[in-house]
């Protein structure tokens, strides 16, 4: 099982969730930890440049959590966003910037 680490944005988002949503996300994150790099669609999708997204819904809202792998196999959860067609390109670019920024702390 892969070790999961949380970027500041993910920590803040998790703290803002209701108990029910938090418990649901923990199950999703645990599944990612168990699957590691073998996670595939529809659960996970590559965004390119070593960044991936978890795909899930909370209530009736499609959400994404972006992540990357470190050289030693840890998974760093980077950003989160509500899935909308209009914002995907911007959110993918933001996730890639977060991955680049945290590569110093999590090589």
What residue spans do the PLM features occupy?
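Basic, Lys/Arg-enriched alpha-helical interface segments
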Residues: 1-62, 71-75, 81-107
């Amino acid at each position: 099982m892969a070790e999961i680490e949380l970027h500041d944005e993910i920590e803040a988002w998790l703290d803002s969730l209701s108990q029910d949503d938090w418990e649901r996300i923990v199950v999703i994150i645990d599944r990612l930890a168990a699957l590691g790099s073998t996670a595939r669609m529809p659960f996970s999708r590559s965004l390119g440049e070593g960044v991936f997204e978890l795909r899930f819904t909370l209530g009736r809202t499609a959400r994404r959590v972006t992540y990357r792998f470190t050289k030693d196999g840890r998974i760093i959860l980077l950003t989160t966003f509500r899935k909308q067609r209009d914002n995907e390109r911007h959110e993918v670019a933001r996730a890639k910037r977060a991955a680049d920024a945290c590569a110093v702390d999590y090589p």
